[in-house]
């Protein structure tokens, strides 16, 4: 996969935009995102979508989505969401599960496998895709020395 900080180029037709077989990816917060569609390449105004991979044993450090919703569909693997005030609640999800995260809910996501990645389709009600996300304090972030 190709590491990129810009959105991959999409094919624009009359009212339909297609991104074919993207190999571009972006690393963020312990997650690898396969290039998808957003305002940057599709002209979307309220939606973005891509595929996220959490490596074996990996973690998406605690963060909050400010003023936008997120829906996920897990294609492969199992995750644990630590969420809520102080990350005091926990929920496990696996392949075939749909997940909805309300705006403003602090959460940290762990890949439960040390040998297999987690792969999920991620849709956001924010076309900017990478804006409006704030770090949230967590013991794991401090222990790992993550930003």
Predicted regions: what they are:
Residues 49-52, 71, 100, 115-132:
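A short hydrophobic beta-strand segment most commonly corresponding to one strand
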Residues 42, 67, 86, 114-116:
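Short strand-connecting beta-turns/loops that link adjacent beta-strands
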Residues 35, 50-66:
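Conserved short histidine dyad/triad with adjacent acidic residue
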Residues 1-46, 61, 135-147:
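A short, N-terminal "cap"/entry segment at the start of jelly-roll beta-barrel domains
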Residues 63-65, 81, 107:
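Histidine-centered active-site/metal-ligand motif
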Residues 42-45, 54-58, 76-80, 126-127:
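Short, charged/polar surface micro-motifs in flexible loops or helix N-caps
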Residues 54-55, 83, 93-112, 124-125:
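Conserved metal-binding segment of the jelly-roll/cupin
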Residues 59, 68-95:
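A short beta-strand-loop-beta hairpin characteristic of the jelly-roll/cupin
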């Amino acid at each position: 996969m190709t590491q990129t900080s810009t959105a991959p180029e999409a094919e624009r037709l009359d009212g339909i935009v297609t991104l074919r077989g993207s190999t571009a990816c972006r690393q963020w917060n312990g997650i690898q995102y396969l290039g998808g569609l957003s305002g940057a390449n599709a002209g979307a105004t309220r939606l973005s979508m891509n595929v996220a991979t959490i490596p074996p044993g990996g973690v998406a450090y605690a963060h909050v989505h400010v003023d936008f919703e997120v829906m996920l569909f897990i294609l492969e693997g199992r995750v644990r969401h630590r969420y809520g005030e102080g990350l005091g609640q926990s929920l496990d999800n696996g392949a075939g599960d749909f997940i909805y995260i309300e705006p403003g809910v602090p959460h940290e996501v762990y890949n439960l496998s040390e040998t297999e990645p987690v792969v999920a389709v991620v849709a956001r009600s924010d076309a900017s895709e990478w804006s409006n996300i704030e770090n949230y304090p967590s013991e794991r972030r401090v222990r790992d020395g993550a930003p």
